[in-house]
Every structure is written in structure tokens, then in C-alpha cells.
């Protein structure tokens, strides 16, 4: 047995990030880039009304749009068998505003027409201003520009059980003209398309989904905005789909998105993580038409770190599994069956977006831990402003690794499928590294030397 001694390098310490985006800051940032007068895309139409308006836990018929209310039973704190249909973009389903809790037990809400803002009475179902809304056994469909099926905002809680939510936007897949105001379509760096999101949680609110289906035609199924402190989306045993384009979930700074035992079928990404937020996925079955995850940051602070945990489940993607663009991340992959058609497991690159968050001094970098798994795919680090730190813990990795600092525990092995270049941290037995004939594994270590590997490749140690 031959042991190789690694370099004694230390990963930079994580620094505290204090940046919290308010709605006003987000609006100002986007308007600074757009021509013409300032535009508040958060603001709903002031003329909008909901078929069922609830104020401080009480049904308010005088504030409701009776013409859109086709049927249902109103009780204390509850509406049952609600039927709503409207097509003017200004009339919504259920609007719960203020303190108190309201329950919808059975609903069929069908809305169409172009909408303004995020939330507001024209939404399929919305809770705001400190309220709680519980929805059971509902079908909510919203069609039209920026027409949301559900929204939770301004310190509220939404819980959805055994329901189907969908949004369709306006046509965009065949070259149709698209709106040009800020945030009526996704920012180009997201590499997606569409003009409506099915659900959004924002401004210190929480949303929980159970045994439900969330479908977006384009842009997004589950989205977050402007946390102003803390935002949470949690989906349990759900099906999350984007049909033509878009992501299943977005993590804005200060936001937390957790998918447990979900089936995700996304036209583009399963999730996009922007800035300092958390994305956790446990025992999910995921298929993506582009990348599995995109991690990036704009308008942010250099200290921001994205926290990503993928535990169990199965992930398949057409594009590189994980794309990291000028981003500090803390990524844990644990016991996950993950593969990409491109053969690339993780690719980190420099973000050419002029709005990309600056790098700062001693950046935390890209920290990846792979635990209790067998994985195939290349890991390629080409962001020259940050370093990658790869830890293998009871893991077998088959693929090239380039540009990373690598640490092994005694139960881990690496089979390099093509020429690789890494820096070794700690000590490793030569028998833990292998490569086929014709492949050279270059390791920057605490010593120099050359070893023939078991499958015919060569291990070159350089200082």
C-alpha cells in the first residue's frame, strides 16, 4: 500500500451576509435596467375583486364579486364547494386578508385574462397581511399574463392539500410577441421562457403543499420573491411540472424551498438558487430538460452562500446536472442516484452577466460533499475567482475531476475516466484512485512521484 500526502490547505471561513431584499429594493433594481418610466410589477390592479373576500377571518360579501361566485356554502371560518369562473383578469377566486384563519374545503376556480402584479384579489387564491388560508380538494386554474393560481405574502401562511394548481400565461412557444415590462417575463440569464408563474411566496410568508399537483406552462411552478427576512415553500408528496419551459422551484435570497418525496418533471430546471437561500430535496424523482440545478447570484453581497441538500431519490437531466455560475455554495449530495446526459455532474463557471454579484475577498467558494453514494459524471471547476472544495465520504466517483481541491475518507474511491487535475487535501492511499490506460491523473500534493494505477492509467504527483 502506498500513501500520498496532500496539501495542508484550509477552505476560507464563511462570512456573514446581511443583505435582505425588500420589495422596494427589488423594484428599484429592475427599473434601473429598463427603459421608460418606473414600473411596479408587484402591485395588483386596484380595481380587482375576488369572488370570496375574507377580511380578518370573516367573509365580507360587500367586498366580494358576486357575479363570479357560481356556488358554494359559507360557514363560520370556512367555505365549501366553491365554484368561481371569471375571464376579465380583474376578478379572482378567494382573497384572505388580515388576521385570522379561513378554510376552503372543495373548490373549482377557473380564471383567465391578463393580470397585474403578484397576488391581489385577481389571484386564484391568495392570503396576505398576516392571515392563514387552508385549501383542500381544490382545482385552481389561471390563464393569462402573470396570472397566479396561488400567492402567500406579507406575513401569511398558506396550506394546500390534495389539490391541483395550474397557470398557463399567454402563448409564447411559437414566436408570439411578448410583453417587455420588467418581470412580465423571466430575466434572460435564467435561460427559460414564459410569462406566468403558478405560485409565489414572498415577504415573510410560508406555503405548504401536500399531495398536490402544481403545473406551470412556462416560467415557474413554485416561485419566491423578496423575502424581506424569511420565506418558506415546502412541498410534500407532490407532483411539480413545467410543461413548455421554466423551473419547478426558485430560491430567492432569504428564501427556503424544501421538496420531500415529490415527483418533478421540469421542461428546464428543477430549481434555480439565487443568492443566500436554502434548497433541500429529499427522496424525489426528478427529470429535467436542461440542468437539474442552476446556482447564480445578481445584485447580491460577496459573502452570500447558497445552501443545497440533495438526499436520496433519483435525478436525471438532459444538460449538465448542476451549473454553478460565480456562486458560493455549500452542497451536500447524499445517497442520490444522479446522472446527466452530458456526462457532467457539476460544472462551475464564471458568470458573464454584468449584474453578477462581485467576488469579494477570500470567497467561500464552491463546497461539495458527496456522501454514501456511487456517482458517475465529471466535475469541472473553471471559475477562476473562486475555488472548489470536494469531499468524498464513503463515496465512489466515476468521472473526470478538474480544478478542484479533493479530500477522501478511507471508504471513498475515485475512477478518473479522462485526464484530470486536482489538488489533494489530506492523505490518500494510491489504491483509492484509478484510471484506464491512456488517462493521467495529475495531483498537486505534498510530494512528487509517479504511480501506475490498477486499470492502466498513471497517477502523477506534482508539487
Which stretches of residues belong to each language-model region?
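N-terminal segments that cap or nucleate solenoid repeat domains
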Residues: 4-6, 22-113, 458-463
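Long, compositionally biased, intrinsically disordered segments
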Residues: 39, 43, 54-55, 102-106, ...
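Sequence termini and other peripheral, non-core segments
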Residues: 9, 238-239, 248
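All-beta strand scaffolds that present successive hydrophobic residues in beta-strands
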Residues: 54, 59, 74-81, 101-106, ...
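Mature extracytoplasmic/periplasmic regions of secreted or cell-envelope proteins
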Residues: 9-16, 34-45, 53-61, 96-98, ...
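Extracellular beta-strand/beta-solenoid scaffold signature
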Residues: 50-52, 60-70, 88-95, 116-126, ...
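Sequence/structural signature of small/polar-enriched beta-strand/turn repeats
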Residues: 150-153, 200-201, 295-298, 321-326, ...
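Extracellular beta-helix/beta-solenoid repeat scaffolds
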Residues: 83-133, 137-142, 148-152, 158-162, ...
Amino acid at each position: 500500500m502506498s500513501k500520498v500526502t496532500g496539501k495542508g490547505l484550509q477552505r476560507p471561513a464563511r462570512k456573514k451576509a446581511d443583505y435582505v431584499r425588500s420589495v422596494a429594493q427589488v423594484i428599484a433594481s429592475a427599473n434601473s435596467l429598463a427603459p421608460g418610466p418606473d414600473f411596479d410589477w408587484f402591485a395588483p390592479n386596484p380595481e380587482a375583486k375576488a369572488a370570496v373576500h375574507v377580511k380578518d377571518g370573516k367573509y365580507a360579501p360587500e367586498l366580494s364579486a358576486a357575479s363570479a361566485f357560481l356556488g358554494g356554502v359559507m360557514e363560520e371560518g370556512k367555505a365549501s364547494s366553491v365554484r368561481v369562473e371569471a375571464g376579465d383578469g380583474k376578478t379572482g377566486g378567494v382573497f384572505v386578508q388580515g388576521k385570522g384563519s379561513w378554510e376552503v374545503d372543495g373548490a373549482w376556480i377557473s380564471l383567465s385574462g391578463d393580470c397585474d402584479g403578484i397576488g391581489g384579489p385577481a389571484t386564484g387564491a391568495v392570503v396576505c397581511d398576516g392571515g392563514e388560508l387552508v385549501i383542500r380538494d381544490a382545482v385552481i386554474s389561471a390563464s393569462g399574463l402573470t396570472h397566479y393560481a396561488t400567492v402567500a405574502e406579507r406575513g401569511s401562511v398558506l396550506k394546500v392539500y390534495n389539490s391541483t394548481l395550474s397557470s398557463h400565461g399567454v402563448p409564447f412557444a411559437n414566436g408570439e410577441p411578448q410583453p417587455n415590462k420588467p418581470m412580465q417575463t423571466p430575466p434572460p440569464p435564467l435561460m427559460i421562457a414564459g410569462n406566468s408563474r403558478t405560485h409565489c411566496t414572498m415577504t415573510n410568508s410560508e406555503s405548504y403543499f401536500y399531495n398536490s399537483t402544481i403545473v406551470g406552462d412556462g416560467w415557474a411552478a413554485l416561485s419566491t420573491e423578496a423575502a424581506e427576512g424569511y420565506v418558506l415553500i415546502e412541498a410534500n408528496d407532490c407532483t411539480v411540472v413545467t410543461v413548455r419551459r421554466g423551473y419547478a422551484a426558485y430560491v430567492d435570497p432569504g428564501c427556503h424551498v424544501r421538496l420531500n418525496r415529490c415527483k418533478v418533471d421540469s421542461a428546464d430546471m428543477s430549481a434555480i438558487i439565487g443568492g443566500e437561500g436554502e434548497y433541500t430535496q429529499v427522496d424525489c424523482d426528478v427529470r429535467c430538460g436542461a440542468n437539474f440545478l442552476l446556482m447564480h447570484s445578481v445584485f447580491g453581497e460577496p459573502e452570500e452562500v447558497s445552501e443545497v441538500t440533495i438526499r436520496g431519490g433519483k435525478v436525471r437531466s438532459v444538460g449538465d446536472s448542476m451549473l454553478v455560475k460565480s456562486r458560493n455554495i455549500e452542497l451536500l449530495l447524499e445517497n442520490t442516484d444522479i446522472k446527466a446526459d452530458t456526462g457532467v455532474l457539476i460544472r462551475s463557471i464564471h458568470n458573464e452577466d454584468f449584474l453578477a454579484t462581485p467576488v469579494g475577498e477570500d470567497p467561500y467558494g464552491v463546497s461539495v460533499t458527496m456522501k454514501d453514494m456511487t456517482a458517475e459524471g465529471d466535475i469541472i471547476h473553471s471559475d477562476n475567482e473562486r475555488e472548489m472544495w470536494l469531499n468524498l465520504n464513503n463515496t465512489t466517483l466515476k468521472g473526470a475531476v478538474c480544478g478542484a481541491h479533493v479530500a477522501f475518507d478511507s471508504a471513498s474511491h475515485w475512477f478518473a475516466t479522462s485526464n484530470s487535475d486536482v489538488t489533494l487535501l489530506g492523505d490518500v492511499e494510491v489504491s483509492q484512485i484509478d484510471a484506464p490506460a491512456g488517462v493521467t491523473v495529475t495531483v498537486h500534493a505534498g510530494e512528487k512521484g509517479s504511480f501506475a494505477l490498477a486499470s492502466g492509467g498513471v497517477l502523477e504527483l506534482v508539487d
